[in-house]
Structures are given as structure tokens and as C-alpha cells.
């Protein structure tokens, strides 16, 4: 019995020795940063910065510090990431990172549509499957006379509008786009407006978001009989990326 116990202790001792001296040690190596700018070489590739130059744009700040604080490492000083569009596709660099697209490629997934167009329509710019990935909606703030367009909780458009006058208010509530008409006329007791472009119906009472050529009060004051007036240019931009069924929320005094 004593011999068995002695042999057991010897076996345990050998096992502990093996664990202490022969188990490989896992070392967590730091990411390679060739130029020592605080941005790893892998991240330098993602941001299209120079792995051998700690200050790619030569503005006196290292690339890592600029990226960490939300500034562009390509254009300085003082230009923030969302203000720069490295590949010129219409989607700012910050948004490219947010939507997981390539800041150096106009068409990240190579499907023939640029990244900005895909995001504005609610598609992923990095996947070719053609399925809509992101929720979209419109908000109209009557108090501020602004229209906001959101994709995946990110405000992509902030447009000045003129909503209905106090005696012909734009209705508050939750609606959706139900019809889209490139050009139409509006006729009433005291108006006859022909050739109005980019009309998006959102209420069965005949309320539209549409372009406007007869005034320039957008963002300044109310002006309409209940419709949401945009400049013709802004209405065209919104119309281009709009679809029937997109929700609209209207609020504010």
C-alpha cells in the first residue's frame, strides 16, 4: 500500500514538472506598427495611410492620434473624418467605416453601384447579395423646419423645408410613402402650380413632399397648404433614393 502511494506521488510530481516546463507559453504579440504612429500596419491599410510615414498628410499630427480623435489622416489640419471622402464616391470616410465599406474603393463589393448609392437605398455596400440590410425612415421636424433622412440610425440627409402654415398645417403622426410622381400640378382656390417635380405622397389626404420653385423660405418659415416643401434640387435627391413604403414621422409645433 505504501509503495502504491509512493508511486502515485512520483507520477503526480512528474506531471506537474511537465506542466511547468514543457507546456508551450502563448505570447500575445503587439500588432506591427512599422512607423510607430499608433496605427497598426493592418489599420494603415484600411485607412490607406503610409505605413512608413507617421504623419501621412504632413499636418504635424501622427496618423494614429488623428484617427483616434476622429480626424482625417489624409487632409489636415482640422478636417474631420466625416468631412473627407478619400475615394470620392459621395460617402464620407467615417460613414465608410461605419457601413463597413472600403474608403479607397468607389464600389466596394464590385456590383456596379457605388457605395453612396447603395447605402442611400438601404443596401450593404460590401455585399453583393442584393438584399436590403438597413432600415430607412424620414423625419420632419415642424418646429425646426427640417427634414431628416436616416439609414441604419445614421442621419444621412438634413434638409431645409417649409411645412404647412398654421391655418393649413402639415399633419403630425406616422405615415409612409404611398405614391411617387415625377411631375404634377397642384390646383386650389388660390393657387395653380404647374410642373412641380419630385412628388412623394405620404397621406391619403393628398399631402406630399415635393420640390418647390415659387419661394425660397426653406428652413425659415412655414409656407404651404400642408405639403412639405423642399427646394427642387433637394427634392430630387430625396426622390432618387426613395421607395414606396418608407416610413415618415412628422412632429413638432
Where are these regions (language model features)?
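Short, basic, low-complexity termini and linkers enriched in Ser/Thr/Gly/Pro
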Residues: 1-23
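Solvent-exposed, acidic/flexible segments
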Residues: 32, 36, 54, 58, ...
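Structural recognition of the beta-strand scaffold that forms the well-ordered cores
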Residues: 51-53, 105, 138-141, 148-150, ...
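Acidic glycine-/aspartate-rich tracts in secreted/extracellular proteins
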Residues: 72, 154, 182-184
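Cell wall/extracellular polymer interaction/catalysis modules
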Residues: 108-110, 116-174
Amino acid at each position: 500500500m505504501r509503495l502504491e502511494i509512493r508511486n502515485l506521488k512520483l507520477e503526480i510530481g512528474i506531471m506537474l514538472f511537465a506542466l511547468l516546463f514543457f507546456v508551450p507559453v502563448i505570447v500575445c504579440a503587439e500588432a506591427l506598427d512599422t512607423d510607430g504612429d499608433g496605427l497598426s500596419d493592418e489599420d494603415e491599410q484600411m485607412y490607406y495611410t503610409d505605413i512608413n510615414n507617421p504623419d501621412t498628410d504632413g499636418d504635424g499630427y501622427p496618423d494614429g492620434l488623428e484617427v483616434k480623435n476622429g480626424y482625417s489622416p489624409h487632409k489636415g489640419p482640422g478636417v474631420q473624418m466625416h468631412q473627407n471622402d478619400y475615394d470620392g464616391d459621395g460617402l464620407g470616410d467615417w460613414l465608410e467605416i461605419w457601413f463597413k465599406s472600403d474608403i479607397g474603393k468607389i464600389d466596394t463589393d464590385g456590383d456596379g453601384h457605388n457605395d453612396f448609392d447603395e447605402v442611400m437605398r438601404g443596401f450593404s455596400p460590401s455585399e453583393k447579395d442584393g438584399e436590403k440590410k438597413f432600415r430607412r425612415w424620414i423625419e420632419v421636424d415642424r418646429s425646426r423646419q427640417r427634414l431628416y433622412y436616416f439609414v441604419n440610425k445614421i442621419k444621412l440627409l438634413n434638409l431645409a423645408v417649409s411645412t404647412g402654415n398654421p391655418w393649413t398645417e402639415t399633419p403630425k403622426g406616422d405615415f409612409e410613402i404611398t405614391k411617387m410622381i415625377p411631375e404634377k400640378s397642384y390646383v386650389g382656390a388660390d393657387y395653380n402650380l404647374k410642373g412641380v417635380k419630385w412628388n412623394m405622397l405620404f397621406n391619403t389626404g393628398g399631402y406630399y413632399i415635393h420640390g418647390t420653385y415659387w419661394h425660397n423660405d426653406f428652413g425659415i418659415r412655414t409656407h404651404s397648404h400642408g405639403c412639405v416643401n423642399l427646394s427642387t434640387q433637394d427634392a430630387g435627391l430625396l426622390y432618387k433614393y426613395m421607395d414606396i413604403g418608407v416610413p415618415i414621422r412628422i412632429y413638432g409645433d
